[in-house]
Amino acid sequence: MVFAVGQRWISESENNLGLGIITEVNSRAVTIFFPAADETRIYATASAPLTRVVFNAGDMITHQQGWQAQVTDIMVNNLTALYLVRRTDNGEEIVLKEIDLAHQINFSQPQDRLFTAQIDRSDRFALRYHALRHQQAQFKSPLRGLRGIRAGLIPHQLHIAKEVGQRLHPRVLLADEVGLGKTIEAGMILQQQIFAGRADRVLIVVPESLQHQWLVEMLRRFNLHFSLFDEERAEDFAATDEQEECNPFDSENLIICSLDWLISRPKRRTQALQTQFDLLIVDEAHHLTWSPEAANPEYQLVESLTKQIPSVLLLTATPEQLGQESHFARLKLLDADRFYDYDAFVAEQRHYRPVADAVQTLLAENPLSAAEKNAISDLLEEQDLEPLFKALDSRNEEEKATVRQELIDSLIDRHGTSRVLFRNTRQGVKGFPRRIYRQINLPLPKQYINAVRVVGRLGKNPEDELFYPERLFQNMDQNAKWWDFDPRVEWLITFLKNHRAEKVLVICRQAQTAVQLEQALRAKEGIRCAVFHERLSIIERDRAAAYFADQENGAQVLLSSAIGSEGRNFQFACRLVLFNLPENPDLLEQCIGRLDRIGQRRDIRIYVPCFADSPQAVLADWFHQGLNAFEEICPMGMALFEKCGQNLQYFLQNPTESAGFEMFLKKTAELRLQLKAELENGRDRLLELNSNGGEAAQRLAEAIRVEDNDTELVNFTLNLFDIIGVEQEDSGEKSIVITPTGTMLVPDFPGLKEEGVTVTFDRELALAREELEFLTWDHPMLRNGIDLVVSGDIGKTAASLLVNNKLPTGTLLLELIYVVESQSPKGLQLNRFLPPTPIRLLLDGKGQDLAAQVGFNRLEKQLKPMAKNMASKMVKMVRPNIEKMLSMAEQLMRERAKTLIGDAQQQADFVLSHELNRLNGLKRVNKNIRQDEIDGLEKIRIRSLSELAKASWRLDCLRVIVSNRA
């Protein structure tokens, strides 16, 4: 291929991008801009999937200004084409440069292939038609971006994701309590933004300890391949890049990095700020602290990022726990114009408290007090509420229920932070199991006592070493086997033998401890174990998780390091052994959270074997008796940990001082109850109602559940694999193994590894076995598989015999599939209104369309394959007839496409105008509606209608059918 600036090419893999212009060429790469879609692509010159567009004499072409002309001659100047053309509107003859060609372009390739004997099989034609039909359905589906997640269908998560994910530029604070799925909500919002074309470049900033958890969650749950950035990665990039001033953040689209790294490395911080991202996610946002006098460095960095990144998701489980000022400051990061003054914010929040109390009364179906009616009237001052209040006093229960809901909905719309803050609590969501704790105090072995004494003589604090005595002992003698005398090991063996039918998760502090425990359990009792730690690759961890999940022949116990288990959930197990205790309440909750998730159906039993009168026992007692963190979630745990840290450290270093410790535990418990009461009193019922989604969220979950059970997905996918040439083997338990073969129609099938992959269509099985690929309409393997078919040449032409004794032999039918589409920027999301839409015609020799009378599947059952040489001869014989039928089909399609495009314009205008009117109405009563959001939506409405007016149609595929008698 010879490239030159100004040449026009199309993408073979993304023909919806329209006609591209080469803007830059060098020895290694070619850059091409696609104006119709406002997209730029860079390809390797040696393997660019591009086709040169050159027209011939007699072809009709279109100028960018819209007028058409017929090519009479072609010339070449500096490798670019010059066309001598005659305009159809005024007959003028001019020279047209190829760079001036219209960016939207149609190719009538199917008939060209047909007349050059490039005739495909009939079953491939059927596959292509079904792929087009399913592609259209998926673009219009309200479940797109929600159903493909590997997770249970939790209504409040789906509600938040749908509500936020469909916004133009979402800027929200996700503040659900621990275990309610903030990461999942953020992932679903992100996925919808990616599907809509609004987020190509994403930066996730998290604490260092959560980097791998996010990496695994994004990959396993959403099939999003993020890159982990640290100093080593940045330096490696600098070493391999030829440019001196290179920015590593420009090298990937989906990036995860730690906040600590950006803070400690000014150069990386500057580089991150110089990069254009579309969406920012910040986890553990409560670490961002602010006051009118000063802000911490973490806050200042995130503030700089939020000023230049249009979409922002902040995640925290403790929105107001660390003070109203910091809570206000986090909201200020999302909308500085709305949250401009702290005192005004406090006054406004105080104003909403009586309203929240009134909502609670409405929910309880109790009569409203005069004060509550006044509070509602103050907020809904533009409405005449007297008829509604009278209706609440009537005896008509149905009318009362309707009025109550109307009032609640109106109050939610006007809530001060309902557009930017979402918070669900366990008390509001319900459905969680109990957590039952048991502490096992064991004697400290003399071997550990001696080791501690040796350490003490070396000047170290011996009590610190007693947190992990096995590590201390092993470091002193690498050949020693601490598991031969450690009573925790004997207790664990007995425990596992007594619960052979149960799956048990054991979490250790370090990977080495987990590995050595596996050796001990296998050698002493032959207990089947899987080991899971950070030194393993993701594939190795998948295998370990699968071995543990296997209910028939799998491991009884999974031995995991604390870091290794991040991002993994083992809800099929209900027994957790903490062989080592984590250092703080947040890490403890993360460990318990491996089992305590929404969807866990059994009570969780937590076991802590520890040494009596040791720092381990002190910490266990403080967690349990002070925080009650084993048996309840403790949202104020870290605040108490920081407040009580100095006293706790004293007792950890003096574990035998029991009298003072009992008083310390009592004071901690009192403080916990006090903070818990404050949090409960501060609960915003109005906010929780808006965050929960109510019945609408339940209906959304049910709709996905119904689609999960639809056999159409399974039938289409297996047919796709079969025709492409992917080998399929039943693997049992609702799963199949698919493997590439040397006879596939394509060199590579998207997402299919050389060694094959095991897939399932069952959500519950996918949750239990993370090594399986969970196939849905949203899965990249299926989306890319459909693209593979519809963007390539598979099934573009076909010829078949119609066995029907009622028709005269030799009756000619022409089945045509046209596609009406809009080649427009992805961010407009016009596929909501006009996705690539297949229109089927079935013409007889007179040009009559029989498609309505003869359905596709009905016709398919009567067709027989035709040998390729016979098909080629037949097409040559009837070519004049086919050309005449094609001309008649074009006339029919012109009117149908016009109607379809007009309907799409009306729908777009209605939907976008309705949303504009809603936002404008709300803005009058809710300051939280941003003006830039309204202005942006109006621009989208105008641009959408303009782009839809340019929509075009093309012949995608055709099938020649000749009748024959049985």
Curated annotation (Swiss-Prot):
Residues in the signal sequence: none
* Keywords assigned: Activator, ATP-binding, DNA-binding, Helicase, Hydrolase, Nucleotide-binding, Transcription, Transcription regulation
Domain Helicase ATP-binding residue range list:
163-337
Give any GO molecular function from the UniProt entry: ATP binding
Name all Helicase C-terminal domain ranges. Answer: 488-642
| UniProt keyword Nucleotide-binding present | yes
Work out whether the entry's keyword set contains ATP-binding: yes
Gene Ontology terms describing biological process:
regulation of DNA-templated transcription
| Superkingdom field | Bacteria
What is the enzyme's class at the highest EC level?
A: hydrolase
Give a single Pfam family match: Tudor_RapA
Residue positions binding ATP: D176, E177, V178, G179, L180, G181, K182, T183
Give the Enzyme Commission number. Answer: 3.6.4.-
* Residue numbers covered by motif DEAH box: 283-286
> Which HAMAP family does the record match to this protein?
Helicase_RapA
Assembly information from the UniProt record: Interacts with the RNAP. Has a higher affinity for the core RNAP than for the holoenzyme. Its ATPase activity is stimulated by binding to RNAP.
The UniProt function text for this chain reads:
Transcription regulator that activates transcription by stimulating RNA polymerase (RNAP) recycling in case of stress conditions such as supercoiled DNA or high salt concentrations. Probably acts by releasing the RNAP, when it is trapped or immobilized on tightly supercoiled DNA. Does not activate transcription on linear DNA. Probably not involved in DNA repair.
The entry sums up its family as follows: Belongs to the SNF2/RAD54 helicase family. RapA subfamily.
- State the name under which the record lists this protein: RNA polymerase-associated protein RapA
Name its species: Actinobacillus succinogenes (strain ATCC 55618 / DSM 22257 / CCUG 43843 / 130Z)
